[in-house]
């Protein structure tokens, strides 16, 4: 039976450290959350994130925008917050409404206030080895891998998923630790074979319980990034937990795994950005 990598424990450790660091700051970090009123799940997530920010001494500000907000007005708001001296970090709803260009948002947000490291420059920094600022979900997954205690150097790591905010940055974070990394996706033909050879298996594909025990190498560390809501309202990951946990040495549950750490990593990013702004003055 696997050891469980409980994200709640790691999140608590991170927030305790952030709170201590924030307490000694004369000016407190502020994070601005931008989202649209029709996205209720993001509203719930950002409201909780705001409360957690305030619990560690930060300031949170919610921007609940009308659905018909134009792309121009949305980009103008980002530009305003880029210049707003009270704002330390900006967190933007993803995915965006269809009428707003993701590319333009990535290009508009200031690299100095990019709380989820989605700008082209900040993503590029990860690719050249700078991991101080990384997308929150990828950073959370990496922290849980490290918490398992596995020797990452030389390990075979398979990342299933190639998104800009999870799969690709997570692969580069693993590369920085000298893992041998394979990125798999929906077009990968020998997926089961690749997974069976993985010492570290990270899954982010958005398909409930897609990865069964047949994909798991005995003793592997399994990181399940997926969160899928079933018809009965229950939450399931991309990995069949019951089957995988019989083979893996360490595994993240869903819920209470990677998702439990993401807000703490967001706050960690905001604190990092805030300190950089202070140091430049």
From Swiss-Prot:
The lineage of its organism: Bacteria, Pseudomonadati, Spirochaetota, Spirochaetia, Brachyspirales. It catalyses: (6R)-5,10-methylene-5,6,7,8-tetrahydrofolate + NADP(+) = (6R)-5,10-methenyltetrahydrofolate + NADPH; (6R)-5,10-methenyltetrahydrofolate + H2O = (6R)-10-formyltetrahydrofolate + H(+). One of its GO terms (molecular function) is methylenetetrahydrofolate dehydrogenase (NADP+) activity. Its EC number is 1.5.1.5, 3.5.4.9. Pathway: One-carbon metabolism; tetrahydrofolate interconversion. Belongs to the tetrahydrofolate dehydrogenase/cyclohydrolase family. Signal peptide: none annotated. This is Bifunctional protein FolD. It comes from Brachyspira hyodysenteriae (strain ATCC 49526 / WA1). Keywords: Amino-acid biosynthesis, Histidine biosynthesis, Hydrolase, Methionine biosynthesis, Multifunctional enzyme, NADP, One-carbon metabolism, Oxidoreductase, Purine biosynthesis. GO terms for cellular component: cytosol. NADP(+) binds at residues 161-163, 186, 227. The keyword NADP applies. Disulfide bonds: none annotated. GO terms for biological process: L-histidine biosynthetic process; methionine biosynthetic process; purine nucleotide biosynthetic process; tetrahydrofolate interconversion. The keyword Oxidoreductase applies. Homodimer. Catalyzes the oxidation of 5,10-methylenetetrahydrofolate to 5,10-methenyltetrahydrofolate and then the hydrolysis of 5,10-methenyltetrahydrofolate to 10-formyltetrahydrofolate.
